[in-house]
C-alpha cells in the first residue's frame, strides 16, 4: 500500500514539483535557511506558496506514522510571520478577525481574516506577545495579500513588521515531542496549555555554562505575565556559538498531536534544528516533509488554505462557524449574518470511502448519479488505510451517514459522510 500511496502523491504533486535543474533555475522561489540541510539529507522538493520546500525524505507514509507514534520535526519556515505593534494593535486586529483576538500575553487563537463579503482571505493564528504587540502567523501563498490587507486598513499608530525571512518556524510534533523539547529548557512545558506559549531558554542537554544572550526586541519580556509561575529565562548574549538561545515557543501545530512550534532566528535555525534531531534519536525522531504534513492534517479535518478554501468561501461554508464570534463588530459580519439567515450555503464535510477508491481534489461528489459537490482534499489515510476526503456538498447531502459516490476517473466509488475528525 505504501508504494502505491507514494506514487499517487507524486502524481498529485507533479505539476508543482521542482524536479529538474532547469525547473529550479527558472522558478523564482524562496528557500528556507535550512535548504542545504534538506538537500544533503536527500529531500525531494516541491514548490508550495512561492517556496521551495521538502516534500518528503524517507517517504510520506513512514514520516506520517513517525509523527503519530513518536516525534517528527518539520521545517515550516514558509509560513508568514508578521508582527503587529502599537497602542491600538488589539483593536485593529480584532476588527479584522472573525474570532476574538486574545488580550492576555502568551495566549494564541486560531481565526479567519475576512473580506467585506464574508469570504476568507486566510486562516491565521494570532498570538498576544504584549498588550500592544502581536504575532500573526499566516499561510505562505496569501502572505502578500494578508500584508496588503493589513496595510489597507492600518491606522497611524499601528506598525507592521514582516519577519518571515528572518525567523524560522519549526514544528516539533508527536506524542514524544514534549519530552524531547523539555530536555532543552528549564521552563516547565507541562504547564504550557494548548494555544499558549512562552519564551524558552534553549540549551542542548550538554554542555551548560554558556554566556547569556539577548532576547530579540520583538519578544522581549513576553511570557512573563500570562503563565503564572512559569520561569522565564534571563536575557542571553546573541551569539549562537555560546550554545544557548531564547525564542518564542507556542503549543500549536497542524497534526493533531502533542507538540510545539518554535520561532528561532535564521542565524539560530540550523543549530536548533540539528540539536533537536541529534538529541531525539532515542525517541525515534525523523525530519518530516510537507507530504506527511498534508496527510496528518487531513486525518484531523484541518483546512488547507488555497484548497479547502480559495477566496470564495465563508467560514460557514468550511465547517468553521465555531470560529465566528457574533457579539462584536468585525469586517464581513453583515454578510455572514445574512448567509446564516438564508441557510442555503454548501457544507464542508468529512467523507470516508467504502471501497478501495482514493479521492483527490476536484473529484465530483454524486448522489444517485446527480452531482452534489466536489472533493476539496483527499488521500489514502496512512493511519486508517482507507480513502478519506473533505468535500463541499449541498446542504441536503451533508448529514453524517449520508451515502454518496465519488467519481474517480469516471468510475463512481461508494462513500459515506462521517463526523470529523477522521482520527
Model-derived features with residue positions:
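N-terminal mitochondrial targeting presequence
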Residues: 1-27
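Short, low-complexity, intrinsically disordered N-terminal modules
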Residues: 1-6, 10, 213-215, 219, ...
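Short linear segments in intrinsically disordered or otherwise low-structure-confidence regions
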Residues: 16-18, 209, 230, 236
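Conserved, structured C-terminal
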Residues: 23-49, 53-55, 128-208, 212-214, ...
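Acidic, proline/glycine-enriched N-terminal capping motif
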Residues: 24-114, 119-121
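Short beta-strand/turn micro-motifs at beta-sheet edges
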Residues: 68, 123-124, 249-250
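Short, charge-rich binding segments
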Residues: 95, 102-104, 112-119, 125-130, ...
Amino acid at each position: 500500500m505504501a508504494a502505491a500511496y507514494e506514487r499517487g502523491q507524486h502524481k498529485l504533486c507533479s505539476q508543482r514539483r521542482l524536479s529538474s535543474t532547469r525547473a529550479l533555475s527558472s522558478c523564482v522561489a524562496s528557500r528556507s535557511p535550512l535548504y542545504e540541510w534538506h538537500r544533503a539529507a536527500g529531500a525531494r522538493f516541491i514548490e508550495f506558496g512561492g517556496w521551495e520546500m521538502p516534500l518528503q525524505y524517507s517517504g510520506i507514509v513512514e514520516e506520517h506514522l513517525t509523527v503519530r507514534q513518536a516525534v517528527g520535526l518539520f521545517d515550516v519556515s514558509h509560513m508568514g510571520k508578521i508582527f503587529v505593534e502599537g497602542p491600538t494593535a488589539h483593536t485593529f486586529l480584532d476588527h479584522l478577525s472573525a474570532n476574538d483576538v486574545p488580550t492576555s500575553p502568551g495566549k494564541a487563537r486560531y481565526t479567519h481574516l475576512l473580506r467585506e463579503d464574508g469570504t476568507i482571505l486566510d486562516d491565521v493564528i494570532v498570538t498576544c506577545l504584549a498588550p500592544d504587540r502581536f504575532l500573526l502567523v499566516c499561510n505562505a501563498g496569501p502572505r502578500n495579500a494578508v500584508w496588503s490587507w493589513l496595510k489597507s486598513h492600518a491606522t497611524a499608530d499601528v506598525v507592521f513588521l514582516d519577519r518571515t525571512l528572518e525567523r524560522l518556524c519549526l514544528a516539533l510534533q508527536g506524542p514524544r515531542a514534549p519530552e524531547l523539547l523539555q530536555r532543552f529548557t528549564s521552563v516547565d512545558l507541562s504547564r504550557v496549555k494548548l494555544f499558549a506559549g512562552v519564551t524558552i531558554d534553549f540549551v542542548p542537554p550538554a554542555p551548560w555554562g554558556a554566556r547569556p544572550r539577548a532576547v530579540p526586541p520583538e519578544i522581549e519580556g513576553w511570557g512573563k505575565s500570562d503563565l503564572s509561575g512559569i520561569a522565564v529565562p534571563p536575557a542571553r548574549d546573541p551569539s549562537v556559538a555560546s550554545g544557548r538561545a531564547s525564542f518564542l515557543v507556542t503549543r500549536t501545530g497542524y497534526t493533531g498531536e502533542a507538540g510545539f512550534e518554535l520561532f528561532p532566528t535564521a542565524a539560530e535555525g540550523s543549530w536548533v534544528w540539528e540539536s533537536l534531531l541529534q538529541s531525539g534519536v532515542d525517541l525515534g525522531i525523523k525530519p518530516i516533509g510537507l507530504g506527511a504534513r498534508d496527510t496528518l492534517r487531513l486525518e484531523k479535518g484541518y483546512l488547507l488554505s488555497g484548497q479547502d478554501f480559495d477566496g470564495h468561501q465563508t467560514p460557514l461554508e468550511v465547517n468553521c462557524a465555531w470560529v465566528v464570534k457574533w457579539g462584536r463588530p468585525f469586517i464581513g459580519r453583515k454578510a455572514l449574518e445574512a448567509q446564516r439567515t438564508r441557510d442555503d450555503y454548501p457544507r464542508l464535510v468529512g467523507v470516508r470511502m467504502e471501497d478501495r477508491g482514493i479521492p483527490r481534489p476536484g473529484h465530483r461528489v454524486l448522489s444517485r448519479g446527480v452531482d452534489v459537490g466536489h472533493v476539496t482534499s483527499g488521500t489514502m489515510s496512512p493511519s486508517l488505510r482507507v480513502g478519506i476526503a473533505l468535500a463541499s456538498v449541498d446542504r441536503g447531502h451533508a448529514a453524517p451517514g449520508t451515502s454518496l459516490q465519488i467519481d474517480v476517473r469516471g468510475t463512481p466509488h461508494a462513500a459515506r459522510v462521517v463526523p470529523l475528525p477522521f482520527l
